Every structure is written in C-alpha cells, then in structure tokens.
C-alpha cells in the first residue's frame, strides 16, 4: 500500500502531522530510515527548533541523501523549519548551509512586532498552486517563528502574510512545497491543504 513518509530526524513535530494525516484517512509512516523515504509516494519534512541544530540532526540521522532525492522526484512538503531547510543557508545562531533545493536564505524577521510571531495570520496567495486549490485568499493559518525565508527567485513565492513586514508564508516549485505556517494546526484550512498535498501523492484514503 502506498503511503506518505514523515521524516523522523529528531527535530520535528512528527506526531501532530501523523495524527492529522490519520484523521484525513491517508496512510502514512514515520520515516527513520532511508528505505521508508525512498519507497514513499510523497514526503513531509517537519521541523522545530534552531536551523543549525536541525541540519546537524538530519546529517546525523543519515537521511540527507534520501531527502534530497525524494525532493527531486515526488511530492515533497517542508513545514515551518522544514520549509526553511529547503533553502541554501540561514544566519540563525550562525551561518549554516541548508539543503539548497531552493535559492535564497533565512534571516530573522525585521519587524517592530513581538517575536516570535505566534498565532493566526492571513494568507495572501500570490501564485495559486495545487496545495492552495479551493482556498479563499485571506484564509487564516497558524504561525510560530522568528525567522523567515528570502527566496532569490520571486517565482518560488506562493503566498505571504503581514507581520509588520511582508513575510513569505508559502513557497512552491514543481513538486516541491513549503509552508512557514503549521497546516496541521491550522483548522479546516490546514486540513484542506494537507488533503490537497495527499491528492498529489495519489495515496488512497
């Protein structure tokens, strides 16, 4: 039976994503080995904490090559820090290389508002894509972050939000997607987006 793999590298909110996919009825597996990732119909890379720690944890897990391969071949979604890891580098704590799947870098949000941004904020969808299908512009989703992406290619920017400055909320390029917000914590809107992602994988309910 086909399934969606949730990458377990020791730095992600695995269970909330797993439970949400279960709720939606999509087969999924916690993936702590490369073969589970390689055999998946789609892959989700969650992430919490600091960028350098997450990249080090991914390296130590031995899953980096499987993740890179999956991101080039099948529907792939990075969530929160997992989205940030898709980019080339971050200056959180210290300059650190990312996965380099998207050009650009991660920097602290320059805003007069309190950091981290915690709570609900509206999406301004700039470039509709498969994951935003059926969503109304201005839909609210749930954020928890202090750093944001600066995509080098504006065409990769799918949606933004306003937090005293324009903050990239979603990126998309081909089969590759990233959500700075947490779809698994974003109510009906988040459920719809994860359903849309699951449809791309063709995993049966």
Where are these regions (language model features)?
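Divalent-cation-assisted or electrostatically stabilized phosphate/pyrophosphate-binding catalytic cores
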Residues: 17
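Short acidic low-complexity segments
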Residues: 29-39
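Cysteine-nucleophile active-site neighborhood
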Residues: 49-119, 195
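Amide-donor transfer/coupling interface in amidating biosynthetic enzymes
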Residues: 105-205
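Extreme N-terminal starter segment of soluble prokaryotic enzymes
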Residues: 1-5
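Short acidic/histidine-rich motifs immediately flanking catalytic phosphotransfer sites
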Residues: 38-47
């Amino acid at each position: 039976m086909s399934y969606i793999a949730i990458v377990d590298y020791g730095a992600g909110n695995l269970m909330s994503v797993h439970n949400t996919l279960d709720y939606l009825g999509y087969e999924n597996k916690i993936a702590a080995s490369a073969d589970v990732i390689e055999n998946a119909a789609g892959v989700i890379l969650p992430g919490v904490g600091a960028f350098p720690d997450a990249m080090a944890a991914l390296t130590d897990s031995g899953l980096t090559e499987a993740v890179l391969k999956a991101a080039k071949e099948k529907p792939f979604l990075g969530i929160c820090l997992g989205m940030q890891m898709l980019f080339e580098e971050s200056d959180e704590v210290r300059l650190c290389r990312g996965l380099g799947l998207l050009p650009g870098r991660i920097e602290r949000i320059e805003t007069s508002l309190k950091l981290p941004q915690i709570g609900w904020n509206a999406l301004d969808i700039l470039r509709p894509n498969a994951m935003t299908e059926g969503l109304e512009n201005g839909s609210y989703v749930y954020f928890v972050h202090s750093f944001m992406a600066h995509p080098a290619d504006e065409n990769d920017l799918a949606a933004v939000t306003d937090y005293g400055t324009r903050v990239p909320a979603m990126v998309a390029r081909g089969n590759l997607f990233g959500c700075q917000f947490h779809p698994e914590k974003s109510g009906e809107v988040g459920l719809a987006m994860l359903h849309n992602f699951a449809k791309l994988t063709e995993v049966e309910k």
